Amino acid sequence: MNQTYGRLVSRAAIAATAMASALLLIKIFAWWYTGSVSILAALVDSLVDIAASLTNLLVVRYSLQPADDEHTFGHGKAESLAALAQSMFISGSALFLFLTSIQNLIKPTPMNDPGVGIGVTVIALICTIILVTFQRWVVRKTQSQAVRADMLHYQSDVMMNGAILIALGLSWYGWHRADALFALGIGIYILYSALRMGYEAVQSLLDRALPDAERQEIIDIVTSWPGVSGAHDLRTRQSGPTRFIQIHLEMEDNLPLVQAHLVAEQVEQAILRRFPGSDVIIHQDPCSVVPTEGKKFELV
């Protein structure tokens, strides 16, 4: 699984970096030629894209290193750090756009030949949609937080390019403040995306539990298994591609130790079939030692 994960995530990071670099060169020319503040917004965003995608590429390679004596749970948390760094990059670009947009609202400047800007923006829009589609497929296959953060960023780029097209069209017909107004709106949306991304990264670093639906699946697998009378103390988290799952099984007091171990092994394999690559720890408890109030399963 780790080889497939690493290959897909690395390809996603390389594709994002290559596309952002190519679009940056095109946008530099378009901004120089038209003077559009909306295109400047897109240019700044491309700079952030490159920095974020390069960070992803380096961090993903580090996160895929196997566990060692100093990092016995692996290096998957590096992905969350990359997502947090991206949120900081994006917040900085949003603040820059705020200042530039306000300045152009106060003193609007007519742009040169909006048609060039429209052509460049259409190219950027098509390329970004293709990239986001590929990233969404990678996220569905790997659940990589770093690629998900990158995808959220490029999804905001799709909306941004659409807004730029409208702004350039309005400017073409003489409404010069539209350029700055749309750039300001883009900045607000980018900042919102950055804050959401940062929140998700922090939650991962704080070892947030797996989603309720996944935990319920684990509970259903465990409690329906022959030989298991009940279960409690389910604890879960995720680091990079690896889910960490801990659970206590409740078994009959007179069940031989070898048989209890065999049942636990079967339950572990069933969980791994549903969540491949997980790190599963199962503890067996005799029913008589489990407090009555602890037998009711809750998602904790």
Curated annotation (Swiss-Prot):
Zn(2+) binds at D45, D49, H153, D157. It holds the Pfam family ZT_dimer. It catalyses: Zn(2+)(in) + H(+)(out) = Zn(2+)(out) + H(+)(in); Cd(2+)(in) + H(+)(out) = Cd(2+)(out) + H(+)(in); Fe(2+)(in) + H(+)(out) = Fe(2+)(out) + H(+)(in). It is a multi-pass membrane protein. GO terms for cellular component: plasma membrane. GO terms for molecular function: cadmium ion transmembrane transporter activity; ferrous iron transmembrane transporter activity; metal ion binding; zinc efflux antiporter activity. Coiled coil: none annotated. Keywords: Cell inner membrane, Cell membrane, Ion transport, Iron, Iron transport, Membrane, Metal-binding, Transmembrane, Transmembrane helix, Transport, Zinc, Zinc transport. The keyword Cell membrane applies. The chain crosses the membrane at residues 24-44, 82-102, 114-134, 156-176, 178-198. It is found in: Cell inner membrane. InterPro entries: Cation_efflux, Cation_efflux_CTD, Cation_efflux_CTD_sf, Cation_efflux_FieF, Cation_efflux_TMD_sf, CDF_Transporter. The keyword Transmembrane applies. GO terms for biological process: intracellular zinc ion homeostasis. Its main location: membrane. Homodimer. Divalent metal cation transporter which exports Zn(2+), Cd(2+) and possibly Fe(2+). May be involved in zinc and iron detoxification by efflux. NCBIfam families: CDF, PRK09509.1. Belongs to the cation diffusion facilitator (CDF) transporter (TC 2.A.4) family. FieF subfamily. This is Cation-efflux pump FieF. It comes from Salmonella schwarzengrund (strain CVM19633). The gene is fieF.
